[in-house]
């Protein structure tokens, strides 16, 4: 049976957990269904972090992997921005925002470390 190399990455596991937490948070939002597109975007952007890490790991070169890690980081920042907007609209609590931001900071640091370690091997 084939093993997927991205499953060996701790950052991928953290990103999957981050997406699960963000999606769980979005399921409890009370937006009167007026802003469904924003809620959907939060779910999509949060899932995109782990998806881009996995896709990049499956690419042919280290440079391509780095590019996908940058895309993953962009999706992470997008998710945090949406969470800040949701907090301003009082759709999520300060505590929920802080939890997401704390997870995002850890993941961003891990992505940066992975990028730097790959650069050293080029």
Where are these regions (language model features)?
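Amphipathic alpha-helical assembly/interaction segments
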Residues: 1-122
């Amino acid at each position: 049976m084939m093993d997927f190399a991205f499953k060996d990455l701790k950052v991928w596991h953290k990103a999957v957990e981050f997406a699960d937490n963000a999606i769980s948070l979005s399921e409890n939002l009370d937006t009167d269904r007026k802003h469904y597109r924003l809620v959907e975007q939060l779910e999509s952007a949060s899932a995109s972090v782990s998806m881009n890490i996995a896709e990049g790991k499956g690419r042919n070169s280290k440079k391509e992997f780095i590019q996908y890690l940058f895309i993953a980081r962009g999706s992470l920042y997008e998710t945090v921005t949406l969470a800040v907007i949701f907090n301003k609209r009082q759709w999520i609590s300060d505590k929920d925002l802080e939890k997401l931001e704390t997870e995002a900071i850890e993941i961003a640091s891990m992505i940066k470390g992975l990028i730097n370690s790959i650069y050293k091997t080029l």
